[in-house]
Amino acid sequence: VIRIPLHKFTSIRRTMSEAAGXVXXLIAKGPISKYATGEPAVRQGPIPELLKNYMDAQYYGEIGIGTPPQCFTVVFDTGSANLWVPSIHCKLLDIACWTHRKYNSDKSSTYVKNGTTFDIHYGSGSLSGYLSQDTVSVPCNPSSSSPGGVTVQRQTFGEAIKQPGVVFIAAKFDGILGMAYPRISVNNVLPVFDNLMQQKLVDKNVFSFFLNRDPKAQPGGELMLGGTDSKYYRGSLMFHNVTRQAYWQIHMDQLDVGSSLTVCKGGCEAIVDTGTSLIVGPVEEVRELQKAIGAVPLIQGEYMIPCEKVSSLPEVTVKLGGKDYALSPEDYALKVSQAETTVCLSGFMGMDIPPPGGPLWILGDVFIGRYYTVFDRDQNRVGLAEAARL
């Protein structure tokens, strides 16, 4: 088993808002949405390339690319399937490129040229560059705290030459390492974990995430490749079958707010996504949900809850496979401090993901933080158990 310590940073959305001042400006303009509403031009297949909102991604770990390894911080993202990092050849006008580590193929003895161009479409522009092949080490430099790393040979990844807009400039991470199914991989590139399985580098084809919800705690969490660790959860794991092998998609029976409201009535589909920090659902249903927890709209789909009311709010229960996964108001109300004031943001956000991929609910870090999550590629299922409070 390989353990990768995860570090928690303030999300870009919060960092930007701190730069912008006032709570009203909390929400960055025009979020870069991974679940883009349009159908991208590139993909002729049946799957729209739903793209993602990294404004809130908060958990990162380190990987190495090349020989000797060049280190990068990446978001280990179960809601996408490609690996990309900034390239040394990025455009001068690409400011995001100035603020991050860049891959230099000249410095790697294991680099193999590919050169195919790639585009990943986002709500606010597209990320583009070309593909290259090299060795990927996870973690970058195995240390005493995370011994035993793994080296994946011949991994194809994207060297980003152009990154859109202001979003990536403020990002604390250099790139993204996608851990979803190959089916949603841009250019049909084999994802890192698939390559790892083919090269038989782990005993079991599973990986699991522990995300520490205590913002001050270090490490911020742990990604484990090839197994699970019972010190991170209580009780036993319950497994839920993947219903469509693209995202880590499972069936959700319903979602209840106390005893006053049920949404996703009659069942719906949900994806478990480590690269999204909130719980996201269809706009109309989330609007009702926010009303039921007394949240008031901010802007761009986010809502605020008066902090003094948090302790008296109802539990929210996600029902999966007949089992109740409860979230207390402390789990779903996020405290954000700014200068002298602390505001509480609702951990739910509305966004409509169009067919054929959608409609979908997204169970992001708010959910995964409370429930230790195991992603099982051998049996195509997601395991959940209550996370231990370390």
Curated annotation (Swiss-Prot):
UniProt PTM comment: N- and O-glycosylated. Undergoes proteolytic cleavage and activation by ADAM30.
Predominant subcellular localization, coarse grouping: other
Propeptide: 1-44
Glycosylation site positions: 114, 241
Domain of life: Eukaryota
Localisation per UniProt entry: Lysosome; Melanosome; Secreted, Extracellular space
Function: Acid protease active in intracellular protein breakdown. Plays a role in APP processing following cleavage and activation by ADAM30 which leads to APP degradation.
Name of this chain's protein: Cathepsin D
Organism of this sequence: Bos taurus
Gene name of the encoded protein: CTSD
